[in-house]
Amino acid sequence: WIMGHMVNAIEQVDEFLDLGANAIEFDIDFDKDGIAQITHHGIPCDCGRKCTKKAIFTEYLDNIRQVTTPDDPKFREQLVLLALDLKLQRISSAKAYRAGEDVAKKLLDHYWQRGNSRARAYILLNIPLVEDYEFIRAFKDTLKNEGYESYNDKVGINSAGNEDLDKIRDVLEILGIHKQVWQADGITSCFARGTERLKEALEKRDTPGYNYINKVYAWTLVRKSIMRRSLRLGVDGVMSNNPDRVIKVLKEKEFADKFRLATYNDNPWEKFRG
Protein backbone atom coordinates (compact mmCIF):
# COMPACT_ATOMS: atom_id res chain seq x y z
CA TRP A 1 0.00 0.00 0.00
CA ILE A 2 1.34 3.41 -1.00
CA MET A 3 -0.38 6.07 1.08
CA GLY A 4 -0.42 9.60 -0.21
CA HIS A 5 0.26 11.77 2.83
CA MET A 6 -1.80 14.76 3.96
CA VAL A 7 -4.29 14.71 1.07
CA ASN A 8 -6.58 17.29 2.64
CA ALA A 9 -7.92 19.26 -0.33
CA ILE A 10 -10.41 17.66 -2.69
CA GLU A 11 -8.31 18.56 -5.72
CA GLN A 12 -5.33 16.73 -4.20
CA VAL A 13 -7.03 13.34 -4.40
CA ASP A 14 -6.53 12.92 -8.15
CA GLU A 15 -3.11 14.54 -7.86
CA PHE A 16 -1.83 11.85 -5.50
CA LEU A 17 -3.55 9.04 -7.37
CA ASP A 18 -1.90 10.23 -10.58
CA LEU A 19 1.46 9.96 -8.78
CA GLY A 20 0.77 6.29 -8.03
CA ALA A 21 -0.87 6.15 -4.59
CA ASN A 22 -3.44 3.42 -3.99
CA ALA A 23 -4.34 4.81 -0.55
CA ILE A 24 -4.69 8.31 0.82
CA GLU A 25 -4.34 9.76 4.30
CA PHE A 26 -6.22 12.88 5.33
CA ASP A 27 -6.45 14.75 8.62
CA ILE A 28 -9.69 15.22 10.54
CA ASP A 29 -9.84 18.40 12.63
CA PHE A 30 -12.48 18.68 15.37
CA ASP A 31 -14.06 21.59 17.18
CA LYS A 32 -13.82 21.79 20.98
CA ASP A 33 -16.95 19.64 21.36
CA GLY A 34 -15.55 16.76 19.31
CA ILE A 35 -17.44 17.47 16.09
CA ALA A 36 -15.47 16.68 12.92
CA GLN A 37 -15.36 19.90 10.90
CA ILE A 38 -12.65 19.92 8.24
CA THR A 39 -9.83 17.96 6.66
CA HIS A 40 -6.85 20.00 7.75
CA HIS A 41 -3.35 19.43 9.15
CA GLY A 42 -2.14 22.90 10.03
CA ILE A 43 1.28 24.27 10.92
CA PRO A 44 3.81 22.73 11.40
CA CYS A 45 3.77 19.88 8.90
CA ASP A 46 6.24 18.09 6.62
CA CYS A 47 9.11 19.96 5.03
CA GLY A 48 8.29 21.17 1.54
CA ARG A 49 4.52 20.83 1.98
CA LYS A 50 1.75 23.40 2.32
CA CYS A 51 0.18 22.76 5.72
CA THR A 52 -3.03 24.75 5.31
CA LYS A 53 -4.97 22.98 2.54
CA LYS A 54 -8.41 21.92 3.72
CA ALA A 55 -11.98 20.97 2.88
CA ILE A 56 -15.30 20.61 4.70
CA PHE A 57 -15.21 17.04 6.05
CA THR A 58 -18.65 16.05 4.77
CA GLU A 59 -17.92 17.50 1.32
CA TYR A 60 -14.65 15.58 1.26
CA LEU A 61 -16.52 12.37 2.08
CA ASP A 62 -19.08 13.05 -0.65
CA ASN A 63 -16.27 13.42 -3.17
CA ILE A 64 -14.26 10.41 -2.03
CA ARG A 65 -17.44 8.31 -2.15
CA GLN A 66 -17.65 9.02 -5.87
CA VAL A 67 -13.95 8.35 -6.41
CA THR A 68 -14.32 4.89 -4.82
CA THR A 69 -17.66 3.89 -6.39
CA PRO A 70 -17.44 1.64 -9.48
CA ASP A 71 -19.15 3.10 -12.57
CA ASP A 72 -19.17 6.62 -11.13
CA PRO A 73 -17.61 9.11 -13.58
CA LYS A 74 -15.02 10.00 -10.91
CA PHE A 75 -14.15 6.37 -10.09
CA ARG A 76 -10.47 5.55 -9.67
CA GLU A 77 -10.04 1.79 -9.38
CA GLN A 78 -6.64 1.97 -7.69
CA LEU A 79 -7.89 3.79 -4.56
CA VAL A 80 -8.68 1.02 -2.10
CA LEU A 81 -7.80 2.38 1.36
CA LEU A 82 -8.68 5.61 3.18
CA ALA A 83 -6.68 6.50 6.29
CA LEU A 84 -8.38 9.04 8.55
CA ASP A 85 -5.75 10.75 10.69
CA LEU A 86 -7.83 11.79 13.68
CA LYS A 87 -6.47 14.93 15.34
CA LEU A 88 -7.83 13.94 18.74
CA GLN A 89 -4.78 15.33 20.50
CA ARG A 90 -6.20 18.79 19.82
CA ILE A 91 -9.31 18.21 21.92
CA SER A 92 -9.98 17.02 25.45
CA SER A 93 -9.81 13.26 25.96
CA ALA A 94 -13.26 13.60 27.52
CA LYS A 95 -14.57 14.46 24.05
CA ALA A 96 -13.08 11.38 22.33
CA TYR A 97 -16.33 9.40 22.66
CA ARG A 98 -18.36 12.23 21.14
CA ALA A 99 -15.86 12.46 18.30
CA GLY A 100 -16.20 8.74 17.59
CA GLU A 101 -19.97 9.03 17.41
CA ASP A 102 -19.74 11.98 15.05
CA VAL A 103 -17.24 10.45 12.62
CA ALA A 104 -19.23 7.21 12.49
CA LYS A 105 -22.46 9.05 11.68
CA LYS A 106 -20.80 11.18 9.03
CA LEU A 107 -19.34 8.10 7.35
CA LEU A 108 -22.78 6.47 7.49
CA ASP A 109 -24.49 9.52 5.99
CA HIS A 110 -21.94 10.70 3.46
CA TYR A 111 -19.76 7.72 2.52
CA TRP A 112 -21.79 4.56 2.99
CA GLN A 113 -25.14 6.43 2.72
CA ARG A 114 -26.65 3.91 5.11
CA GLY A 115 -26.55 1.05 2.63
CA ASN A 116 -27.34 3.01 -0.51
CA SER A 117 -23.74 3.65 -1.55
CA ARG A 118 -21.53 1.24 -3.49
CA ALA A 119 -18.35 2.99 -2.35
CA ARG A 120 -15.93 0.20 -1.61
CA ALA A 121 -12.75 1.53 0.02
CA TYR A 122 -11.52 0.13 3.30
CA ILE A 123 -11.31 2.62 6.17
CA LEU A 124 -8.36 2.93 8.56
CA LEU A 125 -8.90 4.95 11.74
CA ASN A 126 -5.59 6.47 12.84
CA ILE A 127 -5.63 7.04 16.60
CA PRO A 128 -2.84 9.39 17.76
CA LEU A 129 -2.61 8.19 21.38
CA VAL A 130 -4.01 5.15 23.17
CA GLU A 131 -5.57 7.46 25.78
CA ASP A 132 -8.10 8.35 23.09
CA TYR A 133 -9.37 4.77 22.83
CA GLU A 134 -12.90 5.88 23.73
CA PHE A 135 -13.12 7.13 20.13
CA ILE A 136 -12.93 3.52 18.93
CA ARG A 137 -15.51 2.35 21.45
CA ALA A 138 -17.89 5.12 20.39
CA PHE A 139 -17.36 4.45 16.69
CA LYS A 140 -18.26 0.78 17.09
CA ASP A 141 -21.14 1.53 19.47
CA THR A 142 -22.60 3.96 16.94
CA LEU A 143 -22.46 1.52 14.04
CA LYS A 144 -24.24 -1.03 16.23
CA ASN A 145 -26.85 1.40 17.54
CA GLU A 146 -27.59 2.72 14.06
CA GLY A 147 -28.04 -0.81 12.71
CA TYR A 148 -24.94 -0.93 10.50
CA GLU A 149 -22.59 -3.13 12.50
CA SER A 150 -21.69 -4.97 9.27
CA TYR A 151 -19.56 -1.98 8.23
CA ASN A 152 -17.07 -3.02 10.91
CA ASP A 153 -15.73 -5.45 8.31
CA LYS A 154 -14.51 -2.46 6.29
CA VAL A 155 -12.89 -0.62 9.21
CA GLY A 156 -9.46 -1.13 10.77
CA ILE A 157 -7.60 0.51 13.64
CA ASN A 158 -4.12 2.02 13.50
CA SER A 159 -2.01 3.46 16.32
CA ALA A 160 -0.06 6.38 14.92
CA GLY A 161 1.68 7.87 17.95
CA ASN A 162 4.83 5.72 18.19
CA GLU A 163 3.77 4.52 21.64
CA ASP A 164 4.94 1.37 23.40
CA LEU A 165 3.67 -1.62 21.43
CA ASP A 166 2.74 -3.60 24.52
CA LYS A 167 0.76 -0.64 25.84
CA ILE A 168 -1.12 -0.50 22.54
CA ARG A 169 -1.81 -4.24 22.78
CA ASP A 170 -3.22 -3.81 26.29
CA VAL A 171 -5.68 -1.16 25.12
CA LEU A 172 -6.77 -3.28 22.16
CA GLU A 173 -7.35 -6.11 24.61
CA ILE A 174 -9.54 -3.85 26.74
CA LEU A 175 -11.57 -2.97 23.65
CA GLY A 176 -11.82 -6.61 22.58
CA ILE A 177 -10.06 -5.93 19.28
CA HIS A 178 -8.04 -8.87 18.00
CA LYS A 179 -8.13 -8.28 14.26
CA GLN A 180 -8.02 -5.59 11.57
CA VAL A 181 -5.12 -3.80 13.24
CA TRP A 182 -2.38 -1.80 11.53
CA GLN A 183 0.69 -0.40 13.23
CA ALA A 184 2.43 2.76 12.05
CA ASP A 185 5.98 3.79 12.80
CA GLY A 186 7.58 7.01 11.68
CA ILE A 187 8.30 10.67 11.95
CA THR A 188 7.85 13.83 9.91
CA SER A 189 9.92 13.87 6.75
CA CYS A 190 12.00 16.72 8.20
CA PHE A 191 13.86 14.34 10.52
CA ALA A 192 15.66 11.00 10.45
CA ARG A 193 14.38 8.02 12.43
CA GLY A 194 15.95 4.73 13.41
CA THR A 195 14.41 1.32 12.82
CA GLU A 196 14.32 -0.21 16.32
CA ARG A 197 10.58 0.19 16.91
CA LEU A 198 9.75 -0.60 13.29
CA LYS A 199 11.64 -3.88 13.57
CA GLU A 200 9.85 -4.68 16.82
CA ALA A 201 6.47 -4.11 15.17
CA LEU A 202 7.40 -6.32 12.23
CA GLU A 203 8.60 -9.05 14.58
CA LYS A 204 5.29 -8.99 16.45
CA ARG A 205 3.36 -9.03 13.17
CA ASP A 206 5.22 -12.16 12.13
CA THR A 207 4.83 -13.94 15.47
CA PRO A 208 2.37 -16.85 15.08
CA GLY A 209 -0.77 -16.28 17.11
CA TYR A 210 -0.12 -12.58 17.70
CA ASN A 211 -3.38 -10.88 16.71
CA TYR A 212 -2.68 -7.24 17.51
CA ILE A 213 -0.73 -6.30 14.38
CA ASN A 214 -1.80 -7.43 10.91
CA LYS A 215 0.00 -4.81 8.84
CA VAL A 216 2.90 -2.42 9.44
CA TYR A 217 3.70 0.75 7.53
CA ALA A 218 6.42 3.40 7.73
CA TRP A 219 5.89 7.16 7.45
CA THR A 220 6.58 9.78 6.09
CA LEU A 221 9.19 8.63 3.58
CA VAL A 222 10.56 10.95 0.91
CA ARG A 223 14.11 9.67 0.39
CA LYS A 224 14.51 6.62 -1.82
CA SER A 225 17.23 5.25 0.47
CA ILE A 226 14.78 5.16 3.40
CA MET A 227 12.10 3.61 1.19
CA ARG A 228 14.54 0.85 0.25
CA ARG A 229 15.48 0.31 3.88
CA SER A 230 11.84 -0.07 4.88
CA LEU A 231 11.08 -2.45 2.03
CA ARG A 232 14.05 -4.61 2.94
CA LEU A 233 12.65 -4.91 6.45
CA GLY A 234 9.35 -6.13 5.01
CA VAL A 235 6.80 -3.37 5.58
CA ASP A 236 3.30 -3.74 4.17
CA GLY A 237 2.98 -0.09 3.29
CA VAL A 238 4.74 3.23 2.90
CA MET A 239 3.29 6.67 3.51
CA SER A 240 4.91 9.32 1.35
CA ASN A 241 4.62 12.84 0.01
CA ASN A 242 6.04 11.41 -3.21
CA PRO A 243 4.21 8.24 -4.29
CA ASP A 244 5.96 8.39 -7.66
CA ARG A 245 9.30 7.84 -5.94
CA VAL A 246 7.94 4.75 -4.20
CA ILE A 247 6.73 3.44 -7.57
CA LYS A 248 10.22 3.89 -9.03
CA VAL A 249 11.83 2.06 -6.11
CA LEU A 250 9.36 -0.82 -6.44
CA LYS A 251 10.39 -1.22 -10.07
CA GLU A 252 14.06 -1.65 -9.16
CA LYS A 253 15.51 -5.11 -9.69
CA GLU A 254 15.86 -5.78 -5.97
CA PHE A 255 12.14 -5.27 -5.31
CA ALA A 256 10.32 -5.92 -8.59
CA ASP A 257 9.81 -9.63 -7.89
CA LYS A 258 9.05 -9.20 -4.18
CA PHE A 259 6.47 -6.43 -4.06
CA ARG A 260 3.47 -5.24 -6.04
CA LEU A 261 0.80 -2.64 -5.52
CA ALA A 262 -2.17 -3.81 -3.48
CA THR A 263 -5.53 -3.95 -5.25
CA TYR A 264 -9.10 -4.19 -4.01
CA ASN A 265 -8.74 -7.98 -4.05
CA ASP A 266 -6.05 -7.80 -1.37
CA ASN A 267 -7.52 -7.92 2.13
CA PRO A 268 -5.85 -5.21 4.25
CA TRP A 269 -6.79 -7.04 7.45
CA GLU A 270 -4.95 -10.28 6.64
CA LYS A 271 -1.32 -10.95 7.40
CA PHE A 272 0.65 -11.50 4.21
CA ARG A 273 2.03 -15.01 3.91
CA GLY A 274 4.79 -14.80 1.34
UniProtKB/Swiss-Prot annotation:
Binding residue positions for Mg(2+): E25, D27, D85
Subcellular location: Secreted
GO molecular function, one term: toxin activity
Keyword set includes Disulfide bond: yes
Covalent S-S links between cysteines: C45-C51, C47-C190
Catalyzed reactions: an N-(acyl)-sphingosylphosphocholine = an N-(acyl)-sphingosyl-1,3-cyclic phosphate + choline; an N-(acyl)-sphingosylphosphoethanolamine = an N-(acyl)-sphingosyl-1,3-cyclic phosphate + ethanolamine; a 1-acyl-sn-glycero-3-phosphocholine = a 1-acyl-sn-glycero-2,3-cyclic phosphate + choline; a 1-acyl-sn-glycero-3-phosphoethanolamine = a 1-acyl-sn-glycero-2,3-cyclic phosphate + ethanolamine
Tissue expression as described in the entry: Expressed by the venom gland.
Note describing how the cofactor binds: Binds 1 Mg(2+) ion per subunit.
Gene Ontology CC annotation, any one: extracellular region
Chief subcellular location: secreted
Cofactor needs: Mg(2+)
Domain of life: Eukaryota
EC nos: 4.6.1.-
GO biological process: killing of cells of another organism; lipid catabolic process
Keyword Metal-binding found: yes
Active site: H5, H41
Alphabetized UniProt keyword annotations: Cytolysis, Dermonecrotic toxin, Disulfide bond, Hemolysis, Lipid degradation, Lipid metabolism, Lyase, Magnesium, Metal-binding, Secreted, Toxin
Functional summary from the UniProt entry: Dermonecrotic toxins cleave the phosphodiester linkage between the phosphate and headgroup of certain phospholipids (sphingolipid and lysolipid substrates), forming an alcohol (often choline) and a cyclic phosphate. This toxin acts on sphingomyelin (SM). It may also act on ceramide phosphoethanolamine (CPE), lysophosphatidylcholine (LPC) and lysophosphatidylethanolamine (LPE), but not on lysophosphatidylserine (LPS), and lysophosphatidylglycerol (LPG). It acts by transphosphatidylation, releasing exclusively cyclic phosphate products as second products.
Family, per entry: Belongs to the arthropod phospholipase D family. Class II subfamily.
Protein name as catalogued: Dermonecrotic toxin SdSicTox-betaIIB1bxii
Organism this protein belongs to: Sicarius cf. damarensis (strain GJB-2008)
Organism lineage: Eukaryota, Metazoa, Ecdysozoa, Arthropoda, Chelicerata
